[in-house]
């Protein structure tokens, strides 16, 4: 679905409950994760540092396959590499300073049609906008791309060892 994020569409009702729970919840949407692309330059570095049959070579092969698949799916959107959706979300959970956020009441569409949007789409909650006590979600607006990519590629290289 073009309007629902993969992790949300798997269980929109659960995601909506999390958004309304009052928990300290960051949301890193596609508009932000698409700012953090892993390109073939990074995988080339992994290959240079790897033993010919090492873990880094294996990880570079997997990443290059994903980069190629994304490029095949949409050459314009993925010309610079593949988005690191889940790695960025995990990194933000560990280090919220990677992103700048705006606190907003959010909801997840759980139905489609009849004045509903598309199931799984995340939107600002109009009811929460008029209720100052409504739970807020930390919606990421920007990311420190350079810091994240540098840290991510370094950590992968360190974990790979070889």
State where each predicted segment sits.
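Active-site glycine-rich loop that binds ribose-phosphate moieties when present
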Residues: 1-20
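Conformational coupling and interaction surfaces
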Residues: 9, 25-162
């Amino acid at each position: 679905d073009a309007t629902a994020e993969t992790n949300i569409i798997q269980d929109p009702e659960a995601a909506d409950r999390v958004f309304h729970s009052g928990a300290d919840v960051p949301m890193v949407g596609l508009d932000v994760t698409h700012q953090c692309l892993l390109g073939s330059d990074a995988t080339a570095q992994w290959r240079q540092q790897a033993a010919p049959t090492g873990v880094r070579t294996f990880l570079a092969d997997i990443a290059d396959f994903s980069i190629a698949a994304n490029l095949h799916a949409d050459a314009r959107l993925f010309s610079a590499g593949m988005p690191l959706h889940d790695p960025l979300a995990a990194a933000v959970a560990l280090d919220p300073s990677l992103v700048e956020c705006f606190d907003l009441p959010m909801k997840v569409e759980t139905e489609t049609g009849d004045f509903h949007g598309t199931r799984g789409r995340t939107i600002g909650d109009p009811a929460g906008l008029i209720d100052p006590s409504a739970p807020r979600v930390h919606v990421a607006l920007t990311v420190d791309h350079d810091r994240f990519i540098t840290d991510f590629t370094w950590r992968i290289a360190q974990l790979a060892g070889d």
